[in-house]
Structure formats: C-alpha cells, structure tokens
C-alpha cells in the first residue's frame, strides 16, 4: 500500500506522519523528556562529592581492575560511578573531595571493558586531573 492520495487525505497523512515520528530516535529523545531523568539532567558536566574509591573488574576477555570513584552529585544527590583516567591518578583523589564529572564517550553507554561506568573525573578540587598527573599544578590544601 502506498500513501493516501486525494483532496480529503490531509488528515490521514498528517496523523500517519505524527505516529511515524516516534520511530525517529532523535525526535523521541527530544520529546519524551527522559533527558531530565538522567543523572546530569541535560548538562554536560556536574560537580560531586567523592564517597569512596572503587575498583571495577574489566569485562572478558580482559583482566584488570579499572580505578573508579563513587560520586554523589551535588545538584540532585544521585550516586554514580566515575572512571578515573591515567595511571596513578586515583592517588590525587581523596574521599570527600569535590570533583567535576563529564560524560565518557558513547552518548550514555558504558565505554570499552568497564561495565556500567558512563562518566569520568575531569577535575579534583578545582584543578584539572591532567595537570595534576603531569605535575604542572598542585592540589590545593583543604
């Protein structure tokens, strides 16, 4: 069957278009309002307090413990796991530190072999984690 033709077909064409719109991924994303239910609630970054440092086991076939931090977001109190990049950067993070969290790759999906981790740590106590790692800056005494 093709689309309806004729002078009286406008209502049918319009309603069909309206129902078919929901098959479009980007339309659905912008109109369902699910963006506000996610931890970041529509923003690109969020600040949080480190609750604990955790090690998450990598998925098969890899064998490693990926260093992460359990963080409670300040804006809404949600608890998330955030990956700590670079070798030894977990040493710059203490419990109760304020950290800046960003998304981690694949538009809300976990990246690579780290199951369930969708965010990464960018700053610790207002200082870039990369700057701390390269020893260009020091973490402020709190």
Curated annotation (Swiss-Prot):
Comp. bias intervals (Basic residues): 11-20
Region (Disordered): 1-30
Protein keywords: Hydroxylation, Ribonucleoprotein, Ribosomal protein
GO BP: translation
Ranges annotated as biased composition (Basic and acidic residues): 21-30
Pfam families linked to this entry: Ribosom_S12_S23
Record carries keyword Hydrolase: no
Hydroxyproline PTM positions: 61
PANTHER family given in the database record: 30S RIBOSOMAL PROTEIN S12 FAMILY MEMBER
NCBIfam families: uS12_E_A
Family statement: Belongs to the universal ribosomal protein uS12 family.
Protein name: Small ribosomal subunit protein uS12
Taxonomic lineage from the root: Eukaryota, Viridiplantae, Streptophyta, Embryophyta, Tracheophyta
Gene: RPS23
């Amino acid at each position: 069957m093709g689309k309806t033709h004729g002078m009286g077909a406008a209502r049918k064409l319009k309603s069909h278009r309206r129902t078919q719109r929901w098959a479009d991924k980007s339309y659905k994303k912008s109109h369902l309002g699910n963006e506000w239910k996610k931890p970041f609630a529509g923003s690109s970054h969020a600040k949080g307090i480190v609750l604990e440092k955790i090690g998450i086991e990598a998925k098969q076939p890899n064998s490693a413990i990926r260093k992460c931090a359990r963080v409670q977001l300040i804006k809404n109190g949600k608890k998330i796991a955030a990956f700590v990049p670079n070798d030894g950067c977990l040493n710059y993070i203490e419990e109760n530190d304020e950290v800046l969290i960003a998304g981690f790759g694949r538009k809300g999906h976990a990246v690579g072999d780290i199951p369930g981790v969708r965010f990464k740590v960018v700053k610790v106590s207002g200082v870039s984690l990369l700057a701390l790692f390269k020893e260009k800056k020091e973490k402020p005494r709190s």
